Amino acid sequence: MNCRRKPLPLHSNEVQAAESISKDELYSWTLKNVLILFLVQYRASTPSALQTSSFSTPVEKKTNGAFSGSLFSAKEKKDNPKYPKDFIKYLSLALESISMGKEPEYQDQLIRGCFAAFYNNINKSHISKQLKDSRKIEDMFLIFASSVSSELTKRLGTAYDSNLADRITASFIELCKRVTLKGQLASPSSEFVSHLDMYHSKLLNKSEILSTKRVNRGQDQFDLSSFPLLKVFSSVFKVAYSKALLDAEKLFPSIDEAAIAEDIGILIEDLESDACKFSHSVVDFSNYKSYSTWKARELQTLEQHRKIMLSLIPLSSSPNHPIQPIGFPASRKTPTYVPPIARPYFRQLLSLCLEYRLQVTDPVEVKQINTFIRECSIYWRILPSTRCALSMDFAREHLQKGLITSADVLTHFGELHKSLKEWEITYWPKIDVSIFSSALFGIRNALAQLLKKSLLDLLHEKKADFHRWLNIMSICVEDGKVINQDLSPKSEISSVALALQEHCKVIFDEEFDLSKLPSSNFLDEIILASNRISVRIKFLERNCSECIYGVLSLPQIFINIVLPNYIRAALVVAKEYLREKANADINDLTKDMLEIYSDLKQMIHVLQEYHNEEYRIGSFEGFFQPFIDSWLDNVEASAEQWFLRSLEKDNFDENSSEGQYSSSIVDLFHAFHQAFRTLEGFEWEDDLANARFFTRFFRVIYIVLSKYTQWTTQKFFEEANKQDDTSEVQNDNSSSWFSKARNILSGSNEVLPFRFSPTMCILLNNIHFAMHAYEELEQKIDLQRLIEALDVAESTKRHKISATNYLYTIKVVRGEGLHPDGAGKIRTSYIVLTDNKGRRIGKTRPIHSMNPRWDDTFEVKTKDALMITANLWSKGKFNDHEIFGRSSFTLSPKIYGDYLPREEWFDLNPHGELLLRIEMEGEREHIGFYVGRTYHDLERAQREMIKFIVNKMEPVINQNLSTATLKKLLSANTWMDLDKTMTSVTSLLNRTGFSSKSSENVKKEGELTDVQIEAAIYELLDYFDLNFSIIAKHLTKDVFVTVMSYVWDEVVCTTEELLLPPVSVKPINRKPLSPAQMAIVYRWLQFLKDYFYANGEGVKLPVLETDHYKELLRVQEYYDKPTDFLLQECDKIASQLYLSSRMVNNEPVESLPRHSRIKFANKEIYRSGTIRKVHIQTNESELERNERIILRILRMRADSKRFLSKHFQRKGRLLMADAMRNGYVMPLGHLKKLDSR
């Protein structure tokens, strides 16, 4: 293929060529194209459509114009709409502009003169007043008709053509419509605009523009005014329609069908011969396939056009243009109606059309413009790709100049996508692809600038719809993929982000720089500025929350620039304020400074949220730390008032609004939570400082709750003493002196039942409520994190045992082998603990027994070693007390430094032994300690109250579950009236609801029935009924279950004492129970378990079936076994336990450093956080339980003394070895004591 033409010029050259085309030349070529379109449509239509049926009738010339009739009669319709209120104002401005020649569409001198005459008339006062009052469009049209008539008479004389006046009036109506729509005075569908269209239509129908203006060519007459594209043509070129019509009438006779067909033939010949003078060549395409595809389509289209034109040629063709036979070469070498190079002409024409389309609002007219563009491109053989590429290029240009809206841009893209479906971009010429690519890049860059403008408006809190530009940008990016171009706007968006950053700096300097805001109160400055910044951030987050293309986040840009600068400026202002107030009290400044801290802290949180990491600004927290300390000082000073005010308002009424607890504890925790929310709101980021703050706060709570528990416990026992005194008075009144004397002489201890008051229950409920409320408060903080922060800070400090306070907990468990009095009677004994200075530490309750079990706990706080003396006192019947035993022991960190609890037997001089359980804990300025001690105090108070309740029940329990009761039950002479017993038992069964075997179910002769066994303890069950009903009514459900579990544990312990002595190395002079006695004891245990369970309505089985209870049930397995069997079993168990211990300690602890071994064994409360986590007790293994049972049974066997001594010596050595493996060396005196045993 030999192409004899160079490739199409570059885009820039094409633009220059288009700009060099004169408007008149373009006007001429375009008018030819319009007339060709008219001729084609005329020939293709039916003869009746556009051609007159008879041409012999002469046109009658009218001397009177349209205004002489009733076209604009004011009486035509009384309810004609009035023109809008500001219509005359906008119309006057348009008329003034036309009169001065500023409007290119109205350059005709006659039109300008007529419009100027009308403009002068309506500015006259009387006419202006008339129009203002009536606002009727008919009045205005009559005034305009008079003005036109006068002006035309003055210029043309009285013989002017009336059609000229009609055309001028039609132009005026069009002007009125344009002014209305452009000024948005009325909608296109309004009644006023409809009336304008109606008058315009009537005027045209009456005028001779449509009826008499004809063009003659041969025997045919043509009406060019009926062609709508001619009107579009006049508007595009901004000439009067009358002028365009006259030019068309002059040019139309030269338009010939044969010449048109010949032009098409020239184009076909040019394409087939590859001359490429008037069409594209192969060099214009990226590959030959694209060119051949285009060429085939183009030839097919041109052949169709030529056939159509030949079919439209009339039989009598023009003599000037004879029909050229098909297949013969054309007589001309250049087309007559097609420009030599059509692309520049079409580009210039498209520019005019698009500019005019921007001014049009009527959709019908917009559609006509699009049709005009398409039809012109068809005959000039402009490809759809060229039309789309140039259209996108003009869209880029108009967008950069701000001439079009987002809707207009979307219209261009819609036309593009429609064209791409018809003509794939693969077959586009290279020049069109280049233009299209440049247009997309330009549109993308323009969109970035428009996006920047919208975002700037958002920074100033102005509404801006930037999403429309983003949507168009996404369309542009997708279209770029069609031409294999990466139009990702990330770099442009990054540039926009940098510009926005600079603008944010300006915003800070102008609006939020506190140093430039003059004010007398710096606090007001900071608070107001903080509020404005918060409002601005919320506005940005609400209107522009997304991150644009992963590059630009408007809120983050604003926050990153403004907030750090603002915080620094605020700190500078705050420091300046503190320098001015250097002599003021810090407490007076605390409130203001904490308000500033809260505002600035909120700003920092916003920064951290957008950075997803900690954001620190210098020593921000360090600057405000003294004011946090001052606030904590105020809290500590107010704590005493919290305590006192809470007690002043509390009446401890059981009918209070709080329910089963009183108002004092509720008020206290309300104050705690209020202060806690303030401290938590500080959100201190420095873990160590935050841990110290919370340590101080929880120390305050510890102090207040410690006082409250002491006061509550004291009031509880005062209330109990009142009840105790009342019971004694009632007993004194009911008992005879003879009964008292008999008890004294017999040595028996009379049991006085105790009645519990509702106030005691409310006090116990308060303590339980405090425990749960404190637990909820503790769970709101990350206690473990605070503990770790304090531990890490103190890890470098050298561990010194003597540098801290220590808390010793001494539990007086029980006594054994106590000596009777001189008469051989059992003593009522108690223990009093004193220190080396004679100060009393504590006193146990008196118990009437040779082997009393006190289980009373006391606490001693000291730094140094302390000698404790335990004095055993005897309480006489006549309040005469005497000491009959004494033992001493030392409390020292050197002995109890492993922080493990120890149970030790101490000899009571001269007779008996005392079992103590001693445990040491550390006390430090540590949040873990205060939290743990608070739990400890609350639980201790609750335990003491519950223990008091159990202790009051204990004598009744011991009196009924005793060897005396067993002996009486098994004696031959029954000690109770059977009828009375049966009546009481039947009543008891009806009350409790648990079933037992009936009295008719009698066992073998001589054996006791279940009814008789139950009847022996009916007084105990009656006592339980009376007191449990009171505490169940006034205690909360959880506390009631706890009390019942304690009572049940007392029942189990009492039953255990009937069966076994405690573990000890020394034998005991005690005989085991007989099989019958043991059976009765276990029947009692089962009866009481059923009583507490109450068919599922009482205490749940998991609470009743404790390990202690299960261990008691296993006593039956070994109780009657021979001594040799028990000795062998004990040795076997000891060996197994030794092997198990070696396996557990396979990894020795001595491999750890010294401080780690101490920490490993440490049982301090603060190391585990809460008293609930201090020491998790594991269930004793079955082997250890069996060993303990066997050792207790062996104490009652006379021939086991030597075995017990050796067994405990061996066990002591094993304990010493374990302690040494754990890195702790026991004191020598302690080891000697173990060996002596």
Curated annotation (Swiss-Prot):
Residues 591-712 form the MHD1 domain. Pfam families: C2, MUN. Residues 1014-1130 form the MHD2 domain. Residues 786-906 form the C2 domain. SMART domains: C2. One of its GO terms (cellular component) is cleavage furrow leading edge. Gene3D superfamilies: 1.10.357.50, 1.20.58.1100, C2 domain. PANTHER family: ADENYLATE CYCLASE ACTIVATION PROTEIN GIT1, C2 DOMAIN PROTEIN (AFU_ORTHOLOGUE AFUA_7G02350). This is Uncharacterized protein C11E3.02c. It comes from Schizosaccharomyces pombe (strain 972 / ATCC 24843).
